[in-house]
C-alpha cells in the first residue's frame, strides 16, 4: 500500500517538483546546482517551479532538464515524457501572445529604421543636388563675367587702335603725295631751265638738260622695288620662328583669355570649332579657358595636359611655362 501511494504521489508531481525533491534529498542548494550546471540561479529556480520562459527553445529546456536529472541521479526517461505533457499547455497559452507582441514591436522598430534610412538617403541626395547646382551656376556666372570683361577689353583696344590707324594712313598718304609731286617737279624743272637757255647760248645749255634726266632716272627706278621687299619678308617669317609660340586648336566653340608674363593680354574672346590660334609673348603664359575639353594646346612642341579640368568639368585656370 505504501509503495502504491508513493508511486501515485510521484506520478502526480511535476518535472520541477521531482528535480527539487531529488536535490533536497542529496542536500544540494540551488546555488550549488547552478554552479555545477553553469547556469544562472534564476534558471534553476524557474526549472524547479515549472516556469520556464516561452522564448526559450525546447531544445535548451530538454538539455537543462537532462543535465539536472543526471546531477540528482534521476532517470531521464521518466522526466522527458512528463515535460512533453506540461510544456505544450504553457506554450499554447503564453507563446501566441508573446510572439504577437514581439512581432508587433519588431515591425514597429523596422518601420522606424526604414523611415530613418529613407530620410538619410533623401538628405544625401538633396545635398548632392544642391552642391552640383551651386557649382554649375557659379561656373556659368564666371563664364558670363569673363565674356563681359573680354568684350569690354576688346572695345577698349579697338578705341585705342583707331588713332594709330588714322596716323598710319596719313603717314602712308604723305609719302605717296611726295612721290607723286617729285616727278612733276623734276619734269617742270628741266623745262624752266631750257627757256632761258634758248635766249642765251643753246650749245652751253644742252649738256645741262641731258645730264639731270640721266642722273635722276637710275635713282628713282631701283628705290621703289627694293625698299618694301625686306620689310614684307621680315613681317611674314618673324612669328613662325618664335620658340615661345603658344599653339591652340579648337574642336568646339570656346571662350578663352591669354596673357603673358608682362601682364599683356594676347587674346581675349571666343573661337569657333575648327579654329587655330597661335600667340607669342613673354613666358610664362596665364590662360583662362571656359571649355577645356574643346581645345588642344601645344607649347614648345609639347602638348599641355588639361585632363584634370576636363574631368571636373570646370573652367580651366593654368600657367604654361618652359619646362
UniProtKB/Swiss-Prot annotation:
Matching SMART domains: HTH_XRE
Biased composition (Polar residues): 149-172, 179-214
SUPFAM superfamilies hit by this protein: lambda repressor-like DNA-binding domains
Record flagged with keyword Cell membrane: yes
Biased composition (Low complexity): 215-234
DNA-binding region: 30-49
Periplasmic topological segments: 133-323
Stored InterPro entries: Bact_Cytoskel_RodZ, Cro/C1-type_HTH, Lambda_DNA-bd_dom_sf, RodZ, RodZ-like_C
HTH cro/C1-type domain boundaries: 19-71
Region span, Disordered: 149-236
A cellular-component GO term for this protein: plasma membrane
Domain of life: Bacteria
NCBIfam families in the record: PRK10856.1 (NF008109)
PANTHER family found in the cross-reference section: CYTOSKELETON PROTEIN RODZ, PTHR34475
Protein name per Swiss-Prot or TrEMBL: Cytoskeleton protein RodZ
Gene expressing this chain: rodZ
